[in-house]
Amino acid sequence: FFKALLFLGAGSVIIAMHHNENMWDMGGLRKRMPVTYATFLVGSLALAGIVPFAGFWSKDEVLYEALIHGLGTEGSLGTVFLAAYAMGLLAVLFTGFYTFRMVALTFHGEPRTDLAADPESVGWNVKGPLSVLGLLAATTGFLNLAPVKKLTGAKVDFLHQWLEGPEGAALMATLSAKHYKHLLHDVNPAHVTASELGPLLPAALSLGLAVTGALVAFRLYATPEPTEHTAKLGGLQDVLYNNYYQDEYQVWLATNVVQPLAGVADTVDQSLVDGVVDGVSSVSLSSG
């Protein structure tokens, strides 16, 4: 829900800004687009994995399972699980940062252009779906309460049971045994069980990283002049602003490497390959 909400919210902002998609030309839109702002904020909180919004539950469970299997698995496979957990935590930090950088630049501070100061009105044909998706993003995470079950012992994982069906657990066990036998033969979660570690500490860690990223983004970008600190980056600012010059590199690669190679291949194909084929055909025809 929250990803659809953010896409639709971005569309609402683009409509209001007369199809200007540059966040540096925005600012202060929360006062002029309150419905879009409120729903977009809900989607951003969910994407960043802030409790109790929908994204927190799915993100936390993935990280928790990676940690449990990493601590309970011997050898290199356990290291892989722990590396995945560490990369997941790093992604949590950066997701919180870039998500709320987007929120701060778009909706907070002061309008940085005339368009942002007087945006076009967006109708309820857009705001209505935004409101529905915002409500779902704020509430449906509670349907996935497996972490709460692990913490309290309450039988609240009905969504898992419904998705698996009456024979789902047995089917998944059969598939796992059949297809992942060699991969999982070293996994021994009994070394570190969920009851020993508990979900609260890992959840608090990931939540803390998400909040830290969000707060840093707000500190840097929810200001009247968010470009002041970026100017201190010097040449690095140009590299980042131009997306590491990936577009320019790909154009250079296509123009200076791919096209010449394609030309050589075409020449060889037409003159050598086709020439041999045509020559053999001509000899065959002339020899009767």
Question: Predicted segment positions?
Answer:
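Transmembrane-helix bundle segments that line or gate the permeation/cavity pathway
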Residues: I14-M17, A46-F56, G88-R112, A137-L151, ...
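Predominantly late transmembrane helices and immediately cytosolic-facing juxtamembrane segments
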Residues: K3, F7, L82-D118, L145, ...
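Interfacial and helix-entry/exit segments of alpha-helical transmembrane bundles
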Residues: I15-F53, G78-A91, D114-T140, G235-L240
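Aromatic-capped, Gly/Pro-kinked transmembrane alpha-helices
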Residues: P147-L205, F218-G288
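Alpha-helical transmembrane segments of polytopic integral membrane proteins
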Residues: F7-A10, H19, K59-D60, G96-F100, ...
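Alpha-helical multi-pass transmembrane bundles of energy-transducing inner-membrane proteins
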Residues: F1-M23
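Hydrophobic core segments of alpha-helical transmembrane domains in multi-pass membrane transport
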Residues: S44-A48, G88, V92, L133-T140, ...
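Flexible glycine/proline-rich, aromatic-decorated loop/lid segments
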Residues: L29-G78, H108, G153-A170
